C-alpha cells in the first residue's frame, strides 16, 4: 500500500548551467549513498523506461515522479523551470523528496519552491539565502 502524491517544483539555478550540473551531481551522490540502504530508487525500472541518471530531467523524474506517474510536466518559463507530477509511492517517499530539496537548495535561486501534496495535508519548502526553509 502506498500514498498518492501531487508534486510541484519551481526552480532556478543560481549560476545557470554550472549549478544545474552541481544539482545533478548532488542527486547522483544521494542515490549512491542511499540506494539499497533503506531506500529503493527502482533504478532497474527507470532504466527499462529509458530514464538514466545523467540529466536534470532524469534526476527530477527519479525523485519527483514514479514509473506510474500520471502526468509528468517539465516546462521552462521565462525565469523559472516548472515541474508538476502526480504519482503513487511509499509513505516514506515524502521524506526523500524533502531531503533532496534540502540537498540541492544551495544551488537554487532564492524563491525556488517545492510543494508536496500527499493524501492529506501538504509540505511547502522555499529557498531563502541558499537555504531550504519549511513554510508548512
Kindly label every feature range from the protein language model:
Residues 33-65:
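Short, well-structured hydrophobic secondary-structure segments
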Residues 1-41:
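Short, extreme N-terminal segment that most often corresponds to the first beta-strand
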Residues 52-136:
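Charged interaction segments
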Residues 2, 16-20, 49-53, 93, ...:
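Intrinsic-disorder-associated interaction segments
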